[in-house]
Amino acid sequence: MQKTINEAKRIGAFYDFNTFAQNSLTNNLRWFFILDFESTCFEDDIKKPAEIIEFPVVILDSVTGTLIDSFQSFVKPTENPELSVFCSNLTGIQQCDVENAPTLAVVLRKFEHWLRKAKENLGCSFKGQPTSTAIFVTWTDWDISTCLWDECRRKKLPLPGDMLNRIDLKAIFQQWLGSHKIGQKWRGGLKDALNLIGLHFEGRPHRGIDDARNTSRLLLHLLSKNVLNFATS
């Protein structure tokens, strides 16, 4: 972990939160765009490519501690259009939710339009330290670096460039636990992380929009506890 942090510092992809007083950040970062995709999945680890079936993003204003906007869309899978029973039971997403939903190509265009408007309204930028005022947040880096990246590659779709500026909150949470001698080998999920800090998961686990909202609650708690090291991927 320290080697990774040192390398992140060397290339300038490192965010250092030294203070978080009176709900005010001391550097430029203010807006956190938190996403959590849900994808097709199959029982018994059947090797089929994952396709996004829910695409949610919420915006956290870290100064006020509130969610100020959101984007959410179901997505129609095209490679394996029939949801497995396992997938529906896990996520609560039914075949009827995705049957008439737009494809990923259409959802990405809608998302880019929403993101452009959000950046204009908030006056925020993802350009990178030290000018960045916004960053994407995920619970594990799977959502962007594996799920979205692989599907965009297979379907020859452009990956939203702003998503390259992001942080993996699970890695940061593990680092924080390590600093409190709980250990960096902790392997719990989002619900477990919330329980560890005395919060309860609100909504349904494995529903993307609920996962994103709960990730924002965990992030806000970490900010309030002066968690220092935020490294981008």
Regions found by a protein language model. Give the residues of each.
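Metal-dependent phosphoesterase signature
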Residues: 90-118
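Flexible, glycine- and charge-enriched loops at secondary-structure boundaries
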Residues: 46, 101-104, 205
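N-terminal accessory regions of nucleic-acid-interacting proteins
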Residues: 1-37, 42-44
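Metal-dependent phosphoesterase core characteristic of DEDDh/y 3'-5' exonuclease domains
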Residues: 23-25, 30, 48-53, 59-91, ...
